[in-house]
């Protein structure tokens, strides 16, 4: 991706093509992983904590809630890598910093107060969703600079 932008700066069609293919691929994998996670939640929980019904229910429920993260996080990882490839380390670092520290810390402290134990399980997905808003904003704001949309 970086080579397409730097060395072949006039090849905006290829940059757009790579961007759109990447988004489709990430979306396909995200949905696939989410569906697989939902389907294997019961067998996986049984394998690890099948000996305790209460712990089994908590684990299965938690895994199903956490799996919503799989729908989102690939786009954020790609967004950070995308801006790195375009030689915009500042936006890449900002996305990563917000994703891994600021948003996760904020929601893991706040959501359990509002949702109890489910808030803990949902905190990563909510942090990823907040990061997706930031990533999407940067992608829209920089579209005319890099011409990938």
Positions of predicted regions on the chain:
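Mature extracytoplasmic/luminal segments of secretory-pathway proteins
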Residues: 1-2, 93
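Membrane-interface junctions at transmembrane-helix termini in multi-pass inner-membrane proteins
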Residues: 9, 70-97
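Short hydrophobic/aromatic segments of transmembrane alpha-helices and their interfaces
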Residues: 27-29, 73-75, 86, 102-103, ...
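A short pocket-lining beta-strand/turn micro-motif at the edge of beta-sheets
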Residues: 89-91, 101, 107, 118
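Short alpha-helical transmembrane segments in multi-pass integral membrane proteins
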Residues: 3-68, 110-149
